[in-house]
UniProtKB/Swiss-Prot annotation:
GO terms for molecular function: nuclease activity. Belongs to the YqgF nuclease family. This is Putative pre-16S rRNA nuclease. GO terms for biological process: rRNA 5'-end processing. GO terms for cellular component: cytosol. The keyword Nuclease applies. The lineage of its organism: Bacteria, Pseudomonadati, Pseudomonadota, Gammaproteobacteria, Enterobacterales. Could be a nuclease involved in processing of the 5'-end of pre-16S rRNA. NCBIfam families: RNAse_H_YqgF (TIGR00250). Its EC number is 3.1.-.-. It is found in: Cytoplasm. It is an enzyme of class 3 (hydrolase). SUPFAM superfamilies: Ribonuclease H-like (SSF53098).
Amino acid sequence: MSGTLLAFDFGTKSIGVAVGQRITGTARPLPAIKAQDGTPDWNLIERLLKEWQPDEIIVGLPLNMDGTEQPLTARARKFANRIHGRFGVEVKLHDERLSTVEARSGLFEQGGYRALNKGKIDSASAVIILESYFEQGY
């Protein structure tokens, strides 16, 4: 086991990506993947898996603030199931509430409005999802 994990922040137009290390509990953004109505370029996902060889994948689970599911929740679950089905890697879902808000805030502090492009926000959200996963002791 390498201790490497990949995280995805699922979206219908853009999917944020982050890579992290379980040993250090740290994560960093990778370029976001464009999606068409939630469907990514699966060849790109396959390349990421071959390059990073993660022990597991974390997919952010979008929930309402009260913990109930929203329309995007089922699509994120389907995305996670497809990754597992196509590539056989272990996939876990992790609550992503407020990750996008936190990502926007952090990027804005670093570079104002210029830093707020969609791909950067989505991958920064994936970092937050993965760091939150580590913080919860997984």
